[in-house]
Each structure stands twice: as C-alpha cells, then as structure tokens.
C-alpha cells in the first residue's frame, strides 16, 4: 500500500480534492494476499465482514503441506473491498436502514431540529463545503426509546446484536472443527480477573451479546442517524478495541484532509474514530466524516459549543450546549464525551497538582464553574441530556476531566472523586436506558494501573472502561506511543474495553499520517496482547500462524500476517532486497551459518534420521530373536 500523498492545507476546491481522493483510495487499501469476505447472518442484509489472509504452502522433504487462510477482524469497511465502488461525495451504503424501519419506533423529521444546523444548511458561504446527499434526520417517536440497551432489557435481539456476535466470533467456531486448524488454535490459558470471557467461540452468541448489553457491561454505539455503520461492540467480555483521533484546528487541516485521515485510520485498524475538530467548518467536516464512516464516530460537543462562543468559556450556556447535542445527534454521532463529573467542589482539589487540569473539556468546565461560582451545567442538566441521547441512541462516554496529566498526580483525590461521580451518573443514565462507557487516565505508574480498573469496576458498576493509555512514565517525549502502549496492554488485560491511541507526537504537536499509523499499530498490538492475556478464544491463532511461517522461512507469509505488512517487508529488504531472499533460510541478523531456526531444523532432521536408524536396528533385533538368535546358521 502506498503512503498517501500530502494533501494541501486548503485549496479552496474541496470537491476536486475529494474526487481525487475517491479515485485513489482503492489503490491504497490493497492488503497483501488477503481479501475481505462476508459471513451471512440469519437474514440477507446481515453480511458481516472479516479479512482472510491466504498463506503459501510449506515445502518439506516429505512433500507439500497446505497452510489454511487466517481470519482477522477487519474495520476497513468498503474501502477494503476491491469490488466496491467508492465515491466520497455519495457516502457509504445504508446497511441499517431496513433494520431501523422495521422496528417502527422512529420517525423521519420534516427538517433539522437544531437552530445551528438549520442556520448552516442555509448559509451560502458554506454551500461549497456541504455534503450534497443530506437526508432528513430520524428521531424516536414520542414516548419511545430506541437504544440498544432498551431493546436488550426488553429481551429483544436486534440485527445489530447478531451482527456483532458474528463479527466477534470470526467463524472460529467452524474452524475449531477443522483438523488443519487444530495446532494453530492452541493457546495459553488466560487470566481474566473475574471477567466473564467466553471459553469457546461457540459461546459468542447473539444472546450472549444481548445479556452483556442489558447488564451495562457492553455497548453498541449506533446512532439511528448513522445507517452506514457496520456495528461493533465495546465491552470487557469482548475483544479489546482501539480508538483513533482526528480533527482540524484553527491553524491546520482542510476538510478533505480530515476525511483522508479517517480513511487512513481505518486502513490500519481503528475500531472507532473521535472527531476532535476545533477549527473552521466543524459542522461540515463532521457530516463528510460520518457519511463516509463504517465505524462509530465520537465527539466532544463542548469543543464546538465553545467555538460558537468565540472561545470564551464563561459564555457557554445550557441552551447553546443543548442545541449542539441535537445538531450532532441528527448528523449521526454515535457517542458523546461529556464532562459532567467535573464538579465545582472538586476543582480546588487540583490546586496542589504538579500539572493541574490537563483535559481540555475538564478545564473548560472548571473555568465555567469558577467564573459563575455555580455547579457544572452538564451535571445539573444530566437528565435532560439523557432525554436527547435516548431519542437518537447516542452513547455516553463520560469524560474524565480531572484525569492526571503526569504520574505524580495519578490516583489522587480529585481523580477518584470525579470517577465516583461518573458512577452516580452511570446509574442515572441507565434509568433512561442510555448506553454508557467511562473514560479513564491518563498518566499512571505501572504499579498503580490496576487500582484504576478496580475503582472503575466497583464504582461504575462494570460499565465499559475507555482509557487514554495510560502513560507509565513521563520521560519519553517522542516515544509516548510506547510509554502509553505499555500501560494500555496492562489495563486492557485488567478489563478495559477500549484504548484511545497515543501517537509519537503526543505533547509535542499535531500528528501527521505516519504518526497516526504508528499510534494505531502500537495500540492494535497492545489490545491484542491484552486479548491474549485475558484468554479471548482464538486470540493466539494469528501468532501461531506467523510463528509457523517464521520457523519455515515463509517470509512473505510473515509479512502478510503482521499488523503492518508493508513495514515488515521494508525492514527485511533494507539488508536483503533481492527476490531470492524471500525464500532464503536465514535473515541478515544471524546470516546463513548462525540462524537458530535453521540449526533447529537441522537438529530435527538429524533426530528424525537417528530415530529411523534406531527403529531399523530395533526391527533387526526382533527379527534376529525370531530366527532363533543364532549368529551362524
């Protein structure tokens, strides 16, 4: 896959840029020797994607051994399907529309409900930026609740629940019955710390999904205005997911570049995307992203609300924020980060911190509380927020506005006071049947990471935990994808459901596309390490397949099975670029005479030969005895 061309910060001709990007995307998404395939659900319109990596045969002295294809979880959407026609100006296919219609509990509104949304729709200055396929928004009918949590508590298995059950299972229940996968599916026992991890793929059923959602332990972020979505699940008892961030600022990025970053993030495996835009044309940029996003999109609505006040936190009002929530919900945002736990009485607790309040949303609300000496309006209006959320099935991501910004401040009084308030708000949201996940730190030394998970499980009643790392040391600017990846792997093992990626540019500047790639790959491996540690069924399949390819010097399969095939091959080719090196039984690290795996194979061949010789000697001995044990006849 080729690295994307640099996109101009702004050319003034987004339509031309988007057309060029549409033509180029298919080329970029070619995965080596693999294809996107679909598993059929109980109805024709439940087609669940996965990617199958095809392997080369193994050649031995005894003949040829076929290696089976390896299924992997796939987030690429239609961008990873060579057969799909991609036109960003048209958006993605609406795969959920029939499901929404059949439930009969939503209505198509005659027009937008948000004042700001209406204003933007009629602003001639932004006409050239608007997505040209705008549809009228849906909302729950009066007195109806349309959340996945509500359905789950009613005992209803929705198509979304069936979809994610098939997606999590990856057809491993079928493969476990096939002899060619027997050795590849062996894995170490996990340590799940009390989680209800399935022990076999056939336990990952739509009913299992429904129960986990009904209990509040998992969420399916799926706004009714995001019909393009391929449903996914976030929960302690499922695969660990990762989030990638994007967003423009006042000084960088164009609309096209943000769409490109979204697609680029999907290419490397982001399960969800958060649009953290704070610059111009936030509304229009978000529309383009959602209409072309097969994964859930999250936002921090207070950022846009602040932009509407000209950046003056004191001028924020509940009415302004409420209109922003409705605006974004009607566009199709799947989850909102809302910093409702930053209470007025908690702000003084941060005074003696080394780095104070580092959350942008947390600092905005703290400043508002102090300026007005009133309680956080997100807290006092929380029930009204829930009414909006359940009308569109937007999930809460309850923000950790008082998260520690350095390891010195980790696990302090203010952090856990806010966490306990988030637990209170979780209970309140659940009374409305609104889905909830909880955001977590941050910066935490390794020995104190588990305490964060324990506190969250106890005080937030096992709602899914969603953490930013945590970074386990503060001495490595430029390498914070690693400092945070260490913490992420650990807290994922302890029970965190989703990890928010960190790039090498953390604390230093806005990430470019290569930084995004590095951040996502780092977090994919952290999430995978957590899945292995907690014993997710089938998690070790890809590891075993790659290890077998490595031992058999199937270099191309090693590249194909890796998280970043392009980089793995480029590193190999830096020293051994010749085509013949792809079949050589050594690499540049040890050379042909000192390769441990080559020597091991020779030892095995020798042992097999010795075994055959011993067996031949034993057979001759038996024959000698049977003939009377006479030396001479």
Curated annotation (Swiss-Prot):
Cofactor note: Binds 1 [4Fe-4S] cluster per subunit. The cluster is coordinated with 3 cysteines and an exchangeable S-adenosyl-L-methionine.
Residues that, per the record, bind [4Fe-4S] cluster: 587, 590, 595
Pfam families: ThiC-associated, ThiC_Rad_SAM
GO BP: thiamine biosynthetic process; thiamine diphosphate biosynthetic process
InterPro entries attached to this UniProt entry: ThiC, ThiC-associated_dom, ThiC/Bza_core_dom, ThiC/BzaA/B
Cellular component per GO, a single term: cytosol
Class of this enzyme: lyase
Name of protein: Phosphomethylpyrimidine synthase
Native source species: Neisseria meningitidis serogroup C (strain 053442)
